[in-house]
Amino acid sequence: MIEEVVVEGQVYQLVENYKSGFDKKVFTERYSDILAKYDFIVGDWGYDQLRLKGFFDDQNPKATFDTKVAAIDDYLLEYCNFGCAYFIVKRIVK
């Protein structure tokens, strides 16, 4: 079964969970309403802290080069600790 989480009325579906980085409780605690505008959220762990970063679908008119979902791999390589646990959730519009 695909894991979903509801935060502040937004439904998110877990699409990647590298090294078991997804923790529903911590994600819910760290979530900020500013993230609701993004189509995807990446959560990465460093120094026992969860950092969240939003990305838009590549076709979203709000997307810039650095905020497109296609840039997630670059983000993980450049801004995250090497080999860190991370996850990606996708906003589901119902």
At which residue positions do the language-model features occur?
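Ordered hydrophobic segments in well-structured contexts
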Residues: 13, 41-42, 51-53, 85-90
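Compositionally biased, intrinsically disordered or flexible polar/acidic segments
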Residues: 9-18, 60-63, 86, 92-93
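Helix-rich interaction surfaces within compact, conserved domain-sized segments
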Residues: 64-94
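N-terminal interaction modules that seed assembly of large macromolecular complexes
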Residues: 36, 43-60
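N-terminal leader/targeting segments and the first structural element of proteins
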Residues: 1-46
